[in-house]
Regions:
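Active-site/ligand-binding-proximal alpha/beta "capping" segment
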Residues: 143
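Single conserved hydrophobic/aromatic residue that forms the stacking wall/gate
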Residues: 161-170
């Protein structure tokens, strides 16, 4: 499957009608930020310097989440801040995706998702696509990351996904 994705919604500007224009051009998934904050949401890069512009989604970002749902464009949560991800998984009426993230419990990297985030994505019905990039899998340099490291992340996420969620226990 090949899909057109937007790896940073910043170019959409401040005019929400641009969501439709991106959809008309074939965009089928969008990340509201990338390696920096956008007008829609904070990025996970804020962990490095402790900065946040919106404390998650901006008001414009909340509006765009609704429009992305309306047009059937998937919301990619691989780059936004933890608070942005929480808000997106709560606001989105459709499942979100993490198009290239791994398990933070196995590799503490801001781009990886922690157990709490994994549960939010699970509750939302979302999908996590792990990444095979070595620096997301391990901080080990010698030997470098390998297929076992990659599979460990997949196994970990699958185990968490098949465990009862807090909602299932009530």
């Amino acid at each position: 499957v090949i899909m057109i994705g937007v790896e940073n919604a910043y170019p959409m500007g401040l005019n929400t009608s641009n969501v439709r224009k991106f959809w008309e051009r074939g965009a089928r998934y969008v990340s509201l930020s990338h390696n920096g904050h956008s007008q829609f949401t904070d990025s996970n890069t804020g962990e490095f310097d402790g900065t946040a512009l919106h404390n998650g989604l901006s008001d414009l970002g909340k509006e765009v989440v609704e429009l992305l749902n309306y047009y059937g464009i998937m919301i990619d949560i691989s780059h936004p801040s933890k608070e942005g991800i929480r808000q997106m998984t709560e606001l989105s009426k459709a499942p979100v995706i993490a198009s290239h993230s791994s398990a933070r419990a196995l590799r503490d990297h801001p781009r990886n998702v922690d157990d709490e985030q994994l549960n939010w994505i699970k509750e939302n019905g979302g999908v996590i696509q792990t990444t095979a990039l070595g620096f997301f899998l391990t901080d080990r340099e010698d030997p470098p990351a390998n297929m076992d490291d990659f599979m460990d992340h997949i196994d970990y996420i699958c185990l968490l996904y098949t465990s009862p969620s807090p909602r299932d226990l009530h």
